[in-house]
C-alpha cells in the first residue's frame, strides 16, 4: 500500500468518525444537565427544591430543574438521574404531592437512528464482501495489497557500472552479454541466437551478486525493476501470486526490460507435501512465478535476474532451461581478484606510500568483496578517529584484525598469570606450526584480546589453494593442538582456553575420516548423509547410515588422529622449550609479533619430518616414479622464461578461423559478380558461377546459351533456395536460419529488424586478421567485457 492510499484511507475514516460524532452530539438534548445519583434527586424532591421535572419514560431518566443549586449537585440547578423500571408512577405521585410542575416525555426515536442501527452492520458486511472480492481479483486486491512492490530505477539514481565491479570477471563477462544483446541484438539474431530468459547468480554472501545486478541496471539502458523475494509473500492468501502477475504485467508494458529478484530462495524453495501442505501460500506464489517465467503466456523482452545464497534448496522446476537458462557462480575472489577489489575501494582515498595493497591481498585469503570493502572503510574510520590525513599500512592491518576478530577489548583487565598462560598458549601454536613442513607460515601472533578470543596466531597461505593433502590437514591438527600442549608442558594442567582449538581439531579429524576417506581402516567411504526439509532452509542434521561398530571405529580413528597431532606438538615444544620461553617473553613485552621478528626467534628451529603413521594404502603400493613436470617447472630448470598461458579457449580460435574463411569466400564471390559474362545463365556450365553468388536459379540442364520463350521458368520473387556449398569452401557467415522455406526468422520482439551483417561491400571487423593477431579473449563472437 503506497503513501497516497494510506492518506486517503485515514482521511475517509476521520470524516466518517467526525460526522457520526457530530450527529450524536447535536442530537443530544441532555447537554447542560448534571448527572447525579437517584438518592440525591429524591432528596431534592423531598426538600421542596424542585422547580420543574420531566420524566423520560422510554429512557427511564428524570430531569429536574432546581430552585437553587447546592453542594449535593455541585452548584448545578439542572440535574438528571436514572430510576428503576416501574418506578415512574411513584415519581409522578411524589412530584405531584410537592406541587411540582411535571412533564412526561415519551420519545419515539429518530428514523435516522433506527436506520443506522440496522443498516450499519449490513453496510459493514457488504464492505467486507467487496474487499475480499477485490482480493481475489488479482492485482486489484483490496487496499493495494496485490500490487507489486517492485521499484523501477530512475535515471536520476546514482549508477553502478561494470567498472565498479572487480574480482568476478567471469560473471561480468556473462552479464555483459545480456547487456550487449539488449543494446545490439542484430549480431545475435543473425545467428539465430535467443537471449537467455533468466540468469541466476549464486554464491556465498558478500561476493557481489547484488552489485552485479546494480551494474547491469546502470549499463543496460532499459527499464530495470528490482524486488526482494520476501516482498511477494504476506499474511493474506493470494497476495504473492497477485504480486507476481502484477510485476510481470508492468514488465511486459515496459519491455524490453530487466527484473531483478534478490534472495529468491525466500519464494523459490523446493515444493513438497510436508510442512505447509500443497496449498501453502508460498507454493502458490512459486507456481505463479513458474508460469510467468515460462508458460503459455507471452514473455517477450523480459529478462529475469535472480540472486541467492542457497541454490541447493531451490525448486528444480525453477532451475530448468527456459526459466533460468544461465546459472552464474559468484565465488570468493582469488589473489588477482582481491587486488582488483582493493584498488576499486581505495580509489579516491588518500593511501600512504607504506600501505602495501598487494601484500594485503595476499594476507586476506578467503575474504569476500564485502569483507575487503569493509577493511578499507574501517581503515578510513580509524584514520579519521585519530585525526589522520592518510590511510597507512598499520591502519589497514588493524582494520583486518577488526574485521576478522572484532574490536580490541581495551577495558579488559587480566592478571599477570593469565597473561602468561595466554603467551605460552599462543606461542605453542606458533612454534608447532613453524616446525611442521606442510603448513602456511605464521604471519602474526598476538596476545591482545579481540571479540571472544584472548589472542590468536594467524597463518597466511602464500597462494590460493583449492585442494588440501592429508599431510596438510595433519599439520593443521598439530597447529591446533600446540596451545593445549604448551599449557600441559609448562603449567602441568590444561585450561579452558583451548576450547575452540579442540573444536577445530575434532572437526578436521572427523571430516578426514567420514568425508574425505583418509582413513585406511575405514576406506574411501562417505559416512553419514545430510537430511532435512527444504522448508526449513537448512539441513536438519546428519543421519547415521552405518552400524554401531562402524561408529566406534570412526571415533577410534578420530581420536587416533588427534592424539598423534597432540603428541607431535608436545615433542616439538619439548625439543625447543628454550625457544618457546623466548617467544613467550617477547609476547609479554611487545604483545604482537610479526613474521620478521618470528624469523629471528625461530632461527634454530628446523622442519620436522612428516608423520607417516597414516600412510597406509591398504596393501596397495604407490609407484616410485615421480609425476611429470609442468611447463613452468621445466622452464625454471632450463632457465627459460615462464611459458605464456593459452591465449583463449580452442572454440574461440575455431570460430575466428571459420569466420575469416567465410568472409574471404564472400569477398571472392562478390568480386566474381563484376567479371565478363560467360555462358548462358541457365545451362549446366553456368551453374558453377551461380553457386558462387549463392542460390538464385536452379539448373534445368539446358544446353549452354539456349533460349526460348518462357524459358527459364520464373519463380516467385521471395522463393527460397537451399544454399549450396563448395567442397573446399565454408559457407558465408552468417547464414539465415529460416524455420521453413519462404520465411526468415522473425526479429526479437520489441526490436526493429536487423540489417544484414556485415553490410554489402564491407568486411567483418576482424576480417583478414590471422588468429594469432586476435586480442586475447576477444573474437567476433566474444566481445570484451569492460570492468
From Swiss-Prot:
Q: Where is the composition biased (Pro residues)?
A: 710-720, 733-762
Cofactor names from the entry are: Zn(2+)
SUPFAM superfamilies with a match to the protein in the record: FtsH protease domain-like (SSF140990), P-loop containing nucleoside triphosphate hydrolases (SSF52540)
Q: What is its main location?
A: membrane
Q: Tell me the membrane topology, using the record's own terms.
A: Multi-pass membrane protein
The residues exposed to the Cytoplasmic compartment are: 1-5, 132-787
According to the record's subunit comment, the protein's assembly and interactions are: Homohexamer.
Q: What name does UniProt use for this protein?
A: ATP-dependent zinc metalloprotease FtsH
| Annotated source species | Mycobacterium leprae (strain TN)
Source organism lineage?
Bacteria, Bacillati, Actinomycetota, Actinomycetes, Mycobacteriales
**Gene name of this polypeptide:** ftsH
Amino acid at each position: 500500500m503506497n503513501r497516497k492510499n494510506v492518506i486517503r484511507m485515514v482521511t475517509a475514516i476521520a470524516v466518517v468518525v467526525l460526522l457520526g460524532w457530530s450527529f450524536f452530539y447535536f442530537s443530544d438534548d441532555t447537554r447542560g444537565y448534571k448527572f447525579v445519583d437517584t438518592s440525591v434527586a429524591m432528596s431534592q424532591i423531598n426538600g421542596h427544591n424542585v422547580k420543574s421535572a420531566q420524566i423520560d419514560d422510554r429512557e427511564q431518566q428524570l430531569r429536574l430543574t432546581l430552585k437553587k443549586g447546592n453542594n449535593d449537585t455541585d452548584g448545578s440547578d439542572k440535574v438528571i438521574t436514572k430510576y428503576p423500571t416501574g418506578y415512574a408512577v411513584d415519581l409522578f405521585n411524589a412530584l405531584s404531592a410537592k406541587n411540582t410542575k411535571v412533564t412526561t416525555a415519551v420519545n419515539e426515536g429518530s428514523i435516522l437512528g433506527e436506520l443506522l442501527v440496522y443498516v450499519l452492520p449490513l453496510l459493514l458486511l457488504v464492505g467486507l464482501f467487496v474487499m475480499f472480492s477485490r482480493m481475489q481479483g488479482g492485482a486489484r486486491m483490496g487496499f493495494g495489497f496485490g500490487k507489486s512492490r517492485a521499484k523501477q530505477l530512475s535515471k536520476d539514481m546514482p549508477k553502478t557500472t561494470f567498472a565498479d565491479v572487480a574480482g568476478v570477471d567471469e560473471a561480468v563477462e556473462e552479464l555483459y552479454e545480456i547487456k550487449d544483446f539488449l543494446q545490439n541484438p542484430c549480431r545475435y539474431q543473425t545467428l539465430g541466437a535467443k537471449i537467455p530468459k533468466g540468469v541466476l547468480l549464486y554464491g556465498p554472501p558478500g561476493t557481489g551478486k547484488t552489485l552485479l545486478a546494480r551494474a547491469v541496471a546502470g549499463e543496460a539502458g532499459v527499464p530495470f525493476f528490482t524486488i526482494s523475494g520476501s516482498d511477494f509473500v504476506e499474511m493474506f492468501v493470494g497476495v504473492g501470486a497477485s504480486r507476481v502477475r502484477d510485476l510481470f504485467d508492468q514488465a511486459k508494458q515496459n519491455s524490453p526490460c530487466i527484473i531483478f529478484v534478490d534472495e529468491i530462495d525466500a519464494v523459490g524453495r523446493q515444493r513438497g507435501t510436508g510442512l505447509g501442505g500443497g496449498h501453502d501460500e508460498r507454493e502458490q506464489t512459486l507456481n505463479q512465478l513458474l508460469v510467468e517465467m515460462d508458460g503459455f503466456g507471452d514473455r517477450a523482452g523480459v529478462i529475469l535476474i535472480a540472486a541467492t545464497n542457497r541454490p541447493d534448496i531451490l525448486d528444480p522446476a525453477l532451475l530448468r532451461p527456459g526459466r533460468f537458462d544461465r546459472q552464474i557462480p559468484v565465488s570468493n575472489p582469488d589473489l588477482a581478484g582481491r587486488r582488483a577489489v582493493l584498488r576499486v575501494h581505495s580509489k579516491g582515498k588518500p593511501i600512504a606510500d607504506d600501505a602495501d595493497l598487494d601484500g594485503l591481498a595476499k594476507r586476506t585469503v578467503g575474504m569476500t568483496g564485502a569483507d575487503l570493502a569493509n577493511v578499507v572503510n574501517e581503515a578510513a574510520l580509524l584514520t579519521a578517529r585519530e585525526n589522520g590525513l592518510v590511510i597507512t599500512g598499520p591502519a589497514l592491518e588493524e582494520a583486518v584484525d577488526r574485521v576478522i576478530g572484532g574490536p580490541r577489548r581495551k577495558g579488559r583487565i587480566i592478571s599477570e598469570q593469565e597473561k602468561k598462560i595466554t603467551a605460552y598458549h599462543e606461542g605453542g601454536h606458533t612454534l608447532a606450526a613453524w616446525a611442521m613442513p606442510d603448513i602456511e607460515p605464521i604471519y602474526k601472533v598476538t596476545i591482545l584480546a579481540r571479540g571472544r578470543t584472548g589472542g590468536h596466531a594467524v597463518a597466511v597461505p602464500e597462494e590460493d589453494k583449492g585442494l588440501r593433502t592429508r599431510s596438510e590437514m595433519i599439520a593443521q591438527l598439530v597447529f591446533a593442538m600446540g596451545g593445549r600442549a604448551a599449557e600441559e608442558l609448562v603449567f602441568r594442567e590444561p585450561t579452558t582456553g583451548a576450547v575452540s582449538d579442540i573444536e577445530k581439531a575434532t572437526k578436521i579429524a572427523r571430516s578426514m575420516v567420514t568425508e574425505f576417506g583418509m582413513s585406511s581402516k575405514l576406506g574411501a567411504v562417505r559416512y553419514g548423509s545430510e537430511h532435512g526439509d527444504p522448508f526449513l532452509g537448512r539441513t536438519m542434521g546428519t543421519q547415521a547410515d552405518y552400524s554401531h561398530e562402524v561408529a566406534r571405529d570412526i571415533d577410534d580413528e578420530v581420536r587416533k588422529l588427534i592424539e598423534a597431532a597432540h603428541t607431535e606438538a608436545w615433542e616439538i615444544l619439548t625439543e625447543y622449550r628454550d625457544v618457546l620461553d623466548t617467544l613467550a617473553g617477547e609476547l609479554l613485552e611487545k604483545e604482537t609479533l610479526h613474521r620478521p621478528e618470528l624469523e629471528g626467534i625461530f632461527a634454530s628451529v628446523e622442519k620436522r619430518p612428516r608423520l607417516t603413521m597414516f600412510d597406509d594404502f591398504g596393501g596397495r603400493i604407490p609407484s616410485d616414479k615421480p609425476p611429470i613436470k609442468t611447463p613452468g617447472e621445466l622452464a625454471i630448470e632450463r632457465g627459460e622464461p615462464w611459458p605464456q598461458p593459452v591465449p583463449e579457449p580452442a572454440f574461440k580460435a575455431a570460430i575466428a578461423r571459420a569466420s575469416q574463411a567465410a568472409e574471404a569466400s564472400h569477398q571472392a564471390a562478390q568480386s566474381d559478380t563484376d567479371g565478363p559474362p560467360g555462358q548462358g545463365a541457365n545451362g549446366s556450365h553456368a551453374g558453377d558461377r551461380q553457386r558462387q553468388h549463392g542460390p538464385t536459379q536452379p539448373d534445368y540442364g539446358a544446353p549452354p546459351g539456349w533460349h526460348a520463350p518462357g524459358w527459364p521458368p520464373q519463380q516467385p520473387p521471395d522463393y527460397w533456395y537451399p544454399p549450396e556449398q563448395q567442397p573446399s569452401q565454408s559457407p558465408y557467415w552468417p547464414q539465415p536460419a529460416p524455420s521453413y522455406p519462404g520465411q526468415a526468422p522473425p526479429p526479437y520482439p520489441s526490436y526493429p529488424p536487423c540489417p544484414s551483417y556485415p553490410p554489402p561491400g564491407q568486411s567483418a571487423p576482424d576480417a583478414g586478421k590471422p588468429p594469432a593477431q586476435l586480442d586475447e579473449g576477444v573474437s567476433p563472437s566474444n566481445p570484451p567485457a569492460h570492468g
